[in-house]
Amino acid sequence: MINFEAIIGIEVHVVLNTASKMFSKAPNRVDNQKINHFIDPIDLGLPGTLPQVNELAVYKALLLADALKMKTVTNKLVFDRKHYFYQDLPKGFQITQQNYPFAKNGVVTINVDAIEKPIYIDRFHLEEDTAKQHFNHDQILLDFNRCGAPLIEVVTLPVINTAKEAKAYLQKLRQILIVNNISNAKLEDGSMRSDCNVSVRLKGQRQLGTKIEIKNINSLNNVEKAIDLEINRQVKALINGETLSQATLSFDDKTNNNVFMRKKDNTIDYRYFIEPNIMTSNIDDLLLEKPVAFQLEQFQKELIDSNVNPQLVQLVVDDATIFSAFQTINSVIKNPQETIRWLCIELIGQLNKTNSSLTANLIQDLITLIEMLKAAKVNQKQAKQLITLMIETKKDPKSLAKLHNLEQITDPKELQKIIKKIFQENEKEILKNIDRIERIQKLIIGQVMHKTNNRANPQQVFIIVENMLHEVRERDS
Protein backbone atom coordinates (compact mmCIF):
# COMPACT_ATOMS: atom_id res chain seq x y z
CA MET A 1 0.00 0.00 0.00
CA ILE A 2 3.04 2.31 0.25
CA ASN A 3 2.71 3.59 -3.35
CA PHE A 4 -1.07 3.39 -3.57
CA GLU A 5 -3.92 5.38 -2.12
CA ALA A 6 -7.60 4.55 -1.85
CA ILE A 7 -10.29 7.00 -2.95
CA ILE A 8 -13.70 6.38 -1.41
CA GLY A 9 -17.06 8.03 -1.91
CA ILE A 10 -20.16 7.02 0.03
CA GLU A 11 -23.86 7.22 -0.79
CA VAL A 12 -26.15 6.83 2.21
CA HIS A 13 -29.89 6.16 2.03
CA VAL A 14 -31.67 7.25 5.19
CA VAL A 15 -35.29 6.30 5.94
CA LEU A 16 -36.96 9.25 7.68
CA ASN A 17 -38.93 8.46 10.84
CA THR A 18 -42.16 10.14 9.76
CA ALA A 19 -45.58 8.69 10.57
CA SER A 20 -46.60 8.40 6.91
CA LYS A 21 -44.83 7.76 3.61
CA MET A 22 -43.25 10.27 1.26
CA PHE A 23 -46.18 10.76 -1.12
CA SER A 24 -49.09 8.86 0.48
CA LYS A 25 -50.95 8.60 3.78
CA ALA A 26 -49.93 4.95 4.30
CA PRO A 27 -48.13 4.33 7.62
CA ASN A 28 -44.35 4.49 7.34
CA ARG A 29 -43.78 1.14 9.04
CA VAL A 30 -42.02 -2.14 8.37
CA ASP A 31 -43.41 -5.17 10.19
CA ASN A 32 -42.27 -8.68 9.27
CA GLN A 33 -45.46 -10.06 10.83
CA LYS A 34 -47.67 -7.89 8.58
CA ILE A 35 -46.34 -8.29 5.06
CA ASN A 36 -47.93 -5.95 2.46
CA HIS A 37 -50.11 -4.41 5.15
CA PHE A 38 -49.02 -0.74 5.19
CA ILE A 39 -49.71 0.13 1.57
CA ASP A 40 -51.68 2.69 -0.40
CA PRO A 41 -52.84 2.88 -4.05
CA ILE A 42 -50.35 5.74 -4.57
CA ASP A 43 -47.40 3.55 -3.52
CA LEU A 44 -48.55 0.78 -5.88
CA GLY A 45 -48.86 3.19 -8.80
CA LEU A 46 -52.52 2.41 -9.45
CA PRO A 47 -54.24 4.49 -12.17
CA GLY A 48 -55.85 7.73 -11.03
CA THR A 49 -53.70 8.25 -7.94
CA LEU A 50 -51.88 11.52 -7.25
CA PRO A 51 -48.87 11.92 -4.92
CA GLN A 52 -48.89 14.45 -2.06
CA VAL A 53 -45.63 15.69 -0.54
CA ASN A 54 -45.07 14.78 3.12
CA GLU A 55 -44.35 18.16 4.75
CA LEU A 56 -42.67 16.58 7.78
CA ALA A 57 -40.16 14.92 5.43
CA VAL A 58 -39.38 18.38 4.00
CA TYR A 59 -38.95 19.72 7.56
CA LYS A 60 -36.51 16.90 8.40
CA ALA A 61 -34.59 17.55 5.18
CA LEU A 62 -34.19 21.20 6.19
CA LEU A 63 -33.05 20.07 9.63
CA LEU A 64 -30.37 17.83 8.08
CA ALA A 65 -29.26 20.63 5.76
CA ASP A 66 -28.71 22.86 8.80
CA ALA A 67 -26.88 20.09 10.71
CA LEU A 68 -24.53 19.45 7.75
CA LYS A 69 -24.00 23.20 7.13
CA MET A 70 -25.57 22.90 3.67
CA LYS A 71 -27.48 25.39 1.59
CA THR A 72 -30.70 24.57 -0.21
CA VAL A 73 -30.05 24.77 -3.94
CA THR A 74 -33.14 26.85 -4.48
CA ASN A 75 -36.14 27.69 -2.35
CA LYS A 76 -38.21 25.67 -4.82
CA LEU A 77 -39.14 22.05 -4.15
CA VAL A 78 -38.92 20.15 -7.45
CA PHE A 79 -39.26 16.39 -8.01
CA ASP A 80 -38.28 14.26 -11.00
CA ARG A 81 -39.19 10.84 -12.35
CA LYS A 82 -36.38 8.30 -12.59
CA HIS A 83 -37.51 5.59 -15.03
CA TYR A 84 -36.41 1.98 -14.84
CA PHE A 85 -38.20 -1.34 -14.87
CA TYR A 86 -37.65 -3.57 -11.87
CA GLN A 87 -40.01 -5.73 -9.82
CA ASP A 88 -39.61 -3.66 -6.63
CA LEU A 89 -40.83 -0.48 -8.37
CA PRO A 90 -44.52 -0.91 -9.31
CA LYS A 91 -44.93 2.50 -11.00
CA GLY A 92 -42.07 1.87 -13.41
CA PHE A 93 -40.38 5.02 -12.09
CA GLN A 94 -39.13 6.43 -8.80
CA ILE A 95 -39.99 9.96 -7.64
CA THR A 96 -36.66 11.60 -6.74
CA GLN A 97 -34.73 14.88 -7.18
CA GLN A 98 -32.20 14.83 -9.99
CA ASN A 99 -31.93 18.30 -11.48
CA TYR A 100 -32.58 20.23 -8.27
CA PRO A 101 -31.21 18.29 -5.27
CA PHE A 102 -32.57 19.51 -1.94
CA ALA A 103 -29.22 20.77 -0.60
CA LYS A 104 -25.57 21.04 -1.66
CA ASN A 105 -22.06 21.57 -0.27
CA GLY A 106 -21.98 20.29 3.29
CA VAL A 107 -19.35 18.97 5.67
CA VAL A 108 -19.00 16.41 8.46
CA THR A 109 -15.84 16.65 10.57
CA ILE A 110 -14.46 13.32 11.75
CA ASN A 111 -11.68 12.41 14.16
CA VAL A 112 -9.51 9.39 13.39
CA ASP A 113 -6.42 8.62 15.49
CA ALA A 114 -6.65 12.11 17.08
CA ILE A 115 -6.55 13.81 13.64
CA GLU A 116 -9.53 15.87 12.49
CA LYS A 117 -10.58 15.70 8.86
CA PRO A 118 -13.50 17.32 7.00
CA ILE A 119 -15.60 14.98 4.86
CA TYR A 120 -17.31 17.07 2.21
CA ILE A 121 -20.90 16.35 1.20
CA ASP A 122 -21.67 16.98 -2.46
CA ARG A 123 -25.48 16.95 -2.17
CA PHE A 124 -28.53 15.22 -0.77
CA HIS A 125 -32.00 14.75 -2.17
CA LEU A 126 -35.44 13.52 -1.13
CA GLU A 127 -36.98 10.47 -2.76
CA GLU A 128 -39.18 7.44 -2.14
CA ASP A 129 -38.02 3.93 -1.24
CA THR A 130 -38.68 0.76 -3.23
CA ALA A 131 -40.34 -2.48 -2.11
CA LYS A 132 -38.28 -4.97 -0.12
CA GLN A 133 -37.29 -8.16 -1.93
CA HIS A 134 -37.15 -11.57 -0.26
CA PHE A 135 -35.34 -14.29 -2.20
CA ASN A 136 -36.82 -17.76 -1.69
CA HIS A 137 -35.03 -20.38 -3.83
CA ASP A 138 -36.26 -19.62 -7.38
CA GLN A 139 -38.83 -17.04 -6.22
CA ILE A 140 -38.61 -13.31 -5.54
CA LEU A 141 -41.20 -12.25 -2.95
CA LEU A 142 -42.07 -8.57 -2.60
CA ASP A 143 -43.11 -6.69 0.55
CA PHE A 144 -44.55 -3.30 -0.39
CA ASN A 145 -44.63 -2.01 3.21
CA ARG A 146 -41.33 -0.21 2.49
CA CYS A 147 -42.43 1.04 -0.94
CA GLY A 148 -42.91 4.81 -0.83
CA ALA A 149 -41.11 5.32 2.50
CA PRO A 150 -39.45 8.76 2.69
CA LEU A 151 -35.72 8.68 1.95
CA ILE A 152 -32.86 11.12 1.96
CA GLU A 153 -29.83 10.13 -0.11
CA VAL A 154 -26.60 11.79 1.11
CA VAL A 155 -23.66 11.73 -1.32
CA THR A 156 -20.08 12.58 -0.33
CA LEU A 157 -17.32 13.79 -2.59
CA PRO A 158 -14.59 11.15 -3.10
CA VAL A 159 -12.44 12.51 -0.26
CA ILE A 160 -12.30 9.49 2.07
CA ASN A 161 -9.00 7.59 1.98
CA THR A 162 -9.25 4.75 4.49
CA ALA A 163 -11.77 2.26 5.82
CA LYS A 164 -11.37 3.84 9.28
CA GLU A 165 -12.36 7.24 7.90
CA ALA A 166 -15.39 5.72 6.16
CA LYS A 167 -16.54 4.12 9.41
CA ALA A 168 -15.97 7.35 11.36
CA TYR A 169 -17.95 9.36 8.79
CA LEU A 170 -20.91 6.97 8.88
CA GLN A 171 -20.87 6.90 12.68
CA LYS A 172 -20.85 10.73 12.86
CA LEU A 173 -23.60 11.05 10.23
CA ARG A 174 -25.65 8.45 12.11
CA GLN A 175 -25.28 10.40 15.36
CA ILE A 176 -26.40 13.61 13.63
CA LEU A 177 -29.49 11.82 12.29
CA ILE A 178 -30.29 10.39 15.74
CA VAL A 179 -29.90 13.52 17.89
CA ASN A 180 -31.99 15.55 15.43
CA ASN A 181 -34.75 12.89 15.35
CA ILE A 182 -34.46 12.62 11.56
CA SER A 183 -34.13 8.84 11.45
CA ASN A 184 -33.58 5.85 13.72
CA ALA A 185 -30.54 5.25 11.48
CA LYS A 186 -30.23 1.53 12.23
CA LEU A 187 -28.03 -0.25 9.73
CA GLU A 188 -29.30 -3.64 10.88
CA ASP A 189 -32.94 -2.94 9.90
CA GLY A 190 -32.18 -0.97 6.73
CA SER A 191 -33.21 2.48 7.98
CA MET A 192 -29.66 3.57 7.08
CA ARG A 193 -28.05 1.89 4.07
CA SER A 194 -24.67 2.76 2.65
CA ASP A 195 -23.12 2.09 -0.75
CA CYS A 196 -19.33 2.50 -0.72
CA ASN A 197 -17.54 3.31 -3.98
CA VAL A 198 -13.90 2.25 -3.74
CA SER A 199 -11.04 2.83 -6.17
CA VAL A 200 -7.26 2.68 -5.85
CA ARG A 201 -4.60 4.70 -7.67
CA LEU A 202 -0.88 5.43 -7.45
CA LYS A 203 -0.07 8.24 -5.04
CA GLY A 204 0.29 11.52 -6.91
CA GLN A 205 -1.84 10.31 -9.82
CA ARG A 206 -4.77 12.63 -10.61
CA GLN A 207 -6.98 10.23 -12.53
CA LEU A 208 -9.28 8.06 -10.42
CA GLY A 209 -8.95 4.30 -10.58
CA THR A 210 -11.68 1.81 -11.50
CA LYS A 211 -14.66 2.27 -9.19
CA ILE A 212 -16.09 -0.76 -7.40
CA GLU A 213 -19.37 -0.39 -5.50
CA ILE A 214 -20.02 -2.36 -2.28
CA LYS A 215 -23.65 -2.70 -1.19
CA ASN A 216 -25.68 -4.37 1.58
CA ILE A 217 -23.36 -3.62 4.51
CA ASN A 218 -25.33 -4.00 7.74
CA SER A 219 -22.98 -2.64 10.43
CA LEU A 220 -20.26 -0.03 10.87
CA ASN A 221 -17.67 -2.70 11.67
CA ASN A 222 -18.58 -4.51 8.46
CA VAL A 223 -18.17 -1.28 6.49
CA GLU A 224 -14.56 -1.14 7.67
CA LYS A 225 -14.00 -4.84 6.87
CA ALA A 226 -15.59 -4.64 3.41
CA ILE A 227 -13.61 -1.56 2.35
CA ASP A 228 -10.29 -2.93 3.64
CA LEU A 229 -10.91 -6.19 1.75
CA GLU A 230 -11.63 -4.33 -1.48
CA ILE A 231 -8.65 -1.97 -1.15
CA ASN A 232 -6.31 -4.93 -0.61
CA ARG A 233 -7.86 -6.81 -3.57
CA GLN A 234 -7.43 -3.86 -5.93
CA VAL A 235 -3.84 -3.16 -4.82
CA LYS A 236 -2.91 -6.81 -5.34
CA ALA A 237 -4.54 -6.81 -8.79
CA LEU A 238 -2.71 -3.63 -9.86
CA ILE A 239 0.65 -4.95 -8.62
CA ASN A 240 0.05 -8.12 -10.67
CA GLY A 241 -0.76 -6.04 -13.77
CA GLU A 242 -4.41 -7.09 -13.87
CA THR A 243 -7.15 -4.91 -15.37
CA LEU A 244 -10.02 -4.04 -13.05
CA SER A 245 -13.60 -3.79 -14.33
CA GLN A 246 -16.42 -1.79 -12.77
CA ALA A 247 -18.63 -4.03 -10.67
CA THR A 248 -21.06 -4.14 -7.78
CA LEU A 249 -20.16 -6.30 -4.79
CA SER A 250 -22.08 -7.31 -1.70
CA PHE A 251 -20.59 -7.94 1.75
CA ASP A 252 -21.44 -11.38 3.19
CA ASP A 253 -21.31 -11.10 6.99
CA LYS A 254 -21.36 -14.90 7.37
CA THR A 255 -18.12 -15.44 5.46
CA ASN A 256 -16.69 -11.93 6.08
CA ASN A 257 -16.04 -11.58 2.36
CA ASN A 258 -17.15 -9.39 -0.52
CA VAL A 259 -19.26 -11.29 -3.06
CA PHE A 260 -19.64 -10.41 -6.75
CA MET A 261 -23.19 -9.27 -7.68
CA ARG A 262 -23.04 -7.86 -11.21
CA LYS A 263 -20.95 -5.95 -13.73
CA LYS A 264 -21.44 -2.22 -14.29
CA ASP A 265 -20.74 -1.75 -17.97
CA ASN A 266 -22.51 1.37 -19.16
CA THR A 267 -24.22 4.34 -17.62
CA ILE A 268 -27.97 3.66 -17.55
CA ASP A 269 -30.25 6.26 -19.12
CA TYR A 270 -33.01 6.78 -16.56
CA ARG A 271 -34.87 9.28 -18.80
CA TYR A 272 -35.36 11.83 -16.03
CA PHE A 273 -38.03 14.46 -16.38
CA ILE A 274 -39.93 16.68 -13.93
CA GLU A 275 -42.70 14.88 -12.03
CA PRO A 276 -45.87 16.39 -13.60
CA ASN A 277 -48.20 15.40 -10.74
CA ILE A 278 -46.34 17.40 -8.07
CA MET A 279 -46.44 21.15 -8.51
CA THR A 280 -43.19 23.02 -7.97
CA SER A 281 -43.66 24.64 -4.58
CA ASN A 282 -41.95 27.19 -2.38
CA ILE A 283 -40.33 25.59 0.68
CA ASP A 284 -41.07 28.65 2.83
CA ASP A 285 -44.77 28.30 2.00
CA LEU A 286 -44.79 24.68 3.19
CA LEU A 287 -43.31 25.38 6.62
CA LEU A 288 -44.11 27.97 9.27
CA GLU A 289 -40.50 28.19 10.46
CA LYS A 290 -37.06 26.95 9.47
CA PRO A 291 -35.72 24.31 11.86
CA VAL A 292 -32.45 24.70 13.75
CA ALA A 293 -30.31 21.59 14.15
CA PHE A 294 -29.24 20.14 17.50
CA GLN A 295 -25.56 20.92 18.16
CA LEU A 296 -24.09 17.43 18.52
CA GLU A 297 -20.44 18.42 19.05
CA GLN A 298 -21.32 21.07 21.65
CA PHE A 299 -23.51 18.56 23.49
CA GLN A 300 -20.70 15.97 23.56
CA LYS A 301 -18.11 18.54 24.69
CA GLU A 302 -20.27 19.84 27.55
CA LEU A 303 -20.84 16.32 28.89
CA ILE A 304 -17.17 15.30 28.62
CA ASP A 305 -16.11 18.60 30.25
CA SER A 306 -18.48 17.69 33.10
CA ASN A 307 -16.43 14.50 33.68
CA VAL A 308 -18.94 12.17 32.02
CA ASN A 309 -17.18 9.10 30.63
CA PRO A 310 -16.72 9.64 26.84
CA GLN A 311 -17.84 6.04 26.20
CA LEU A 312 -21.17 6.77 27.93
CA VAL A 313 -21.56 9.93 25.84
CA GLN A 314 -21.03 7.80 22.72
CA LEU A 315 -23.61 5.29 23.97
CA VAL A 316 -26.21 8.07 24.30
CA VAL A 317 -25.71 9.56 20.83
CA ASP A 318 -25.31 6.19 19.08
CA ASP A 319 -28.83 4.94 19.81
CA ALA A 320 -32.08 6.75 19.00
CA THR A 321 -34.01 5.09 21.85
CA ILE A 322 -31.35 5.89 24.46
CA PHE A 323 -30.92 9.49 23.25
CA SER A 324 -34.70 10.06 23.35
CA ALA A 325 -34.80 8.57 26.87
CA PHE A 326 -31.93 10.84 27.95
CA GLN A 327 -33.75 13.92 26.62
CA THR A 328 -37.00 12.92 28.35
CA ILE A 329 -35.36 12.20 31.73
CA ASN A 330 -33.00 15.17 31.71
CA SER A 331 -35.81 17.59 30.83
CA VAL A 332 -37.22 16.79 34.30
CA ILE A 333 -34.07 16.00 36.33
CA LYS A 334 -31.92 18.77 34.78
CA ASN A 335 -28.71 17.01 35.72
CA PRO A 336 -27.07 15.34 32.70
CA GLN A 337 -24.43 13.53 34.75
CA GLU A 338 -27.00 11.90 37.07
CA THR A 339 -29.31 11.18 34.13
CA ILE A 340 -26.57 9.37 32.19
CA ARG A 341 -25.41 7.49 35.28
CA TRP A 342 -28.84 6.11 36.20
CA LEU A 343 -29.97 5.58 32.60
CA CYS A 344 -26.84 4.12 31.00
CA ILE A 345 -25.01 2.41 33.85
CA GLU A 346 -27.79 1.28 36.17
CA LEU A 347 -30.97 0.85 34.09
CA ILE A 348 -29.53 -0.17 30.72
CA GLY A 349 -26.87 -2.24 32.50
CA GLN A 350 -29.63 -4.28 34.17
CA LEU A 351 -31.68 -4.45 30.96
CA ASN A 352 -28.70 -5.92 29.09
CA LYS A 353 -28.24 -8.59 31.77
CA THR A 354 -31.87 -9.70 31.44
CA ASN A 355 -32.10 -9.15 27.65
CA SER A 356 -34.99 -6.71 28.23
CA SER A 357 -36.01 -3.58 26.30
CA LEU A 358 -36.14 0.06 27.35
CA THR A 359 -39.82 1.05 27.45
CA ALA A 360 -41.69 4.33 27.92
CA ASN A 361 -42.96 3.12 31.32
CA LEU A 362 -39.42 2.33 32.50
CA ILE A 363 -38.27 5.80 31.44
CA GLN A 364 -41.05 7.44 33.50
CA ASP A 365 -40.31 5.11 36.42
CA LEU A 366 -36.64 6.07 36.32
CA ILE A 367 -37.61 9.76 36.51
CA THR A 368 -39.68 8.96 39.61
CA LEU A 369 -36.81 6.96 41.12
CA ILE A 370 -34.23 9.73 40.61
CA GLU A 371 -36.66 12.21 42.20
CA MET A 372 -37.06 9.83 45.15
CA LEU A 373 -33.26 9.79 45.47
CA LYS A 374 -33.06 13.59 45.38
CA ALA A 375 -35.74 13.78 48.07
CA ALA A 376 -33.78 11.24 50.20
CA LYS A 377 -36.74 8.84 50.16
CA VAL A 378 -34.37 6.07 49.04
CA ASN A 379 -30.60 5.72 49.10
CA GLN A 380 -28.25 4.62 46.31
CA LYS A 381 -28.30 0.95 47.31
CA GLN A 382 -32.10 0.89 47.55
CA ALA A 383 -32.41 2.66 44.18
CA LYS A 384 -30.33 -0.07 42.51
CA GLN A 385 -32.50 -2.77 44.12
CA LEU A 386 -35.62 -0.96 42.91
CA ILE A 387 -34.33 -0.86 39.32
CA THR A 388 -34.01 -4.65 39.34
CA LEU A 389 -37.54 -4.96 40.75
CA MET A 390 -38.93 -2.44 38.23
CA ILE A 391 -37.63 -4.57 35.35
CA GLU A 392 -38.82 -7.86 36.88
CA THR A 393 -42.30 -6.75 38.00
CA LYS A 394 -43.06 -3.80 35.66
CA LYS A 395 -44.34 -1.92 38.75
CA ASP A 396 -43.54 1.68 39.71
CA PRO A 397 -40.74 2.43 42.24
CA LYS A 398 -42.99 4.06 44.86
CA SER A 399 -45.23 1.02 45.28
CA LEU A 400 -42.21 -1.32 45.12
CA ALA A 401 -40.40 0.66 47.82
CA LYS A 402 -43.39 0.27 50.16
CA LEU A 403 -43.99 -3.37 49.25
CA HIS A 404 -40.36 -4.41 49.81
CA ASN A 405 -39.64 -2.07 52.74
CA LEU A 406 -37.04 -0.15 50.75
CA GLU A 407 -37.96 3.38 51.79
CA GLN A 408 -35.37 5.43 53.67
CA ILE A 409 -36.18 6.35 57.26
CA THR A 410 -35.95 10.14 57.33
CA ASP A 411 -38.29 10.97 60.22
CA PRO A 412 -36.01 12.52 62.94
CA LYS A 413 -38.23 11.26 65.79
CA GLU A 414 -38.11 7.67 64.53
CA LEU A 415 -34.34 7.86 64.03
CA GLN A 416 -33.80 9.40 67.49
CA LYS A 417 -35.79 6.57 69.05
CA ILE A 418 -33.63 3.93 67.31
CA ILE A 419 -30.36 5.72 68.12
CA LYS A 420 -31.33 6.34 71.75
CA LYS A 421 -31.92 2.61 72.23
CA ILE A 422 -28.49 1.83 70.73
CA PHE A 423 -26.90 4.39 73.07
CA GLN A 424 -28.51 2.64 76.04
CA GLU A 425 -27.35 -0.78 74.84
CA ASN A 426 -23.77 0.47 74.40
CA GLU A 427 -23.55 2.91 77.34
CA LYS A 428 -20.42 1.35 78.91
CA GLU A 429 -18.54 1.24 75.58
CA ILE A 430 -19.49 4.84 74.83
CA LEU A 431 -18.35 6.18 78.21
CA LYS A 432 -15.15 4.16 78.05
CA ASN A 433 -14.21 5.59 74.62
CA ILE A 434 -15.82 9.04 74.87
CA ASP A 435 -12.53 10.70 73.89
CA ARG A 436 -12.24 8.52 70.77
CA ILE A 437 -15.18 10.17 69.09
CA GLU A 438 -14.67 8.80 65.55
CA ARG A 439 -14.56 5.21 66.77
CA ILE A 440 -17.81 5.66 68.75
CA GLN A 441 -19.50 7.35 65.79
CA LYS A 442 -18.61 4.46 63.48
CA LEU A 443 -19.81 1.93 66.06
CA ILE A 444 -23.21 3.56 66.57
CA ILE A 445 -23.83 4.45 62.91
CA GLY A 446 -22.93 0.89 61.90
CA GLN A 447 -25.43 -0.53 64.39
CA VAL A 448 -28.14 1.92 63.25
CA MET A 449 -27.68 0.86 59.62
CA HIS A 450 -27.68 -2.81 60.65
CA LYS A 451 -30.87 -2.50 62.72
CA THR A 452 -32.69 -0.58 59.97
CA ASN A 453 -31.42 -2.84 57.16
CA ASN A 454 -29.61 0.19 55.65
CA ARG A 455 -32.86 2.14 55.47
CA ALA A 456 -31.81 4.96 57.82
CA ASN A 457 -30.75 8.18 56.12
CA PRO A 458 -26.95 8.31 56.75
CA GLN A 459 -26.71 12.11 56.81
CA GLN A 460 -29.47 12.47 59.39
CA VAL A 461 -28.09 9.59 61.46
CA PHE A 462 -24.67 11.27 61.54
CA ILE A 463 -26.14 14.58 62.75
CA ILE A 464 -28.27 12.94 65.46
CA VAL A 465 -25.36 10.75 66.68
CA GLU A 466 -23.03 13.75 66.73
CA ASN A 467 -25.52 15.79 68.80
CA MET A 468 -26.17 12.95 71.25
CA LEU A 469 -22.45 12.31 71.75
CA HIS A 470 -21.94 16.02 72.37
CA GLU A 471 -24.62 15.85 75.09
CA VAL A 472 -22.91 12.83 76.71
CA ARG A 473 -19.55 14.64 76.77
CA GLU A 474 -21.14 17.77 78.21
CA ARG A 475 -22.88 15.74 80.89
CA ASP A 476 -19.75 13.84 81.92
CA SER A 477 -17.34 16.77 81.86
Swiss-Prot record:
GO biological process, one term: translation
Keyword ATP-binding: yes
Enzyme Commission (EC) number: 6.3.5.-
UniProt keyword terms in alphabetical order: ATP-binding, Ligase, Nucleotide-binding, Protein biosynthesis
Pfam families: GatB_N, GatB_Yqey
PANTHER family the record matches: GLUTAMYL-TRNA GLN AMIDOTRANSFERASE SUBUNIT B MITOCHONDRIAL AND PROKARYOTIC PET112-RELATED, GLUTAMYL-TRNA(GLN) AMIDOTRANSFERASE SUBUNIT B, MITOCHONDRIAL
HAMAP family in UniProt: GatB
Summary of subunit composition and partner proteins: Heterotrimer of A, B and C subunits.
Function: Allows the formation of correctly charged Asn-tRNA(Asn) or Gln-tRNA(Gln) through the transamidation of misacylated Asp-tRNA(Asn) or Glu-tRNA(Gln) in organisms which lack either or both of asparaginyl-tRNA or glutaminyl-tRNA synthetases. The reaction takes place in the presence of glutamine and ATP through an activated phospho-Asp-tRNA(Asn) or phospho-Glu-tRNA(Gln).
Protein name (Swiss-Prot/TrEMBL): Aspartyl/glutamyl-tRNA(Asn/Gln) amidotransferase subunit B
Organism: Mycoplasma genitalium (strain ATCC 33530 / DSM 19775 / NCTC 10195 / G37)
Phylogenetic placement of the source organism: Bacteria, Bacillati, Mycoplasmatota, Mycoplasmoidales, Mycoplasmoidaceae
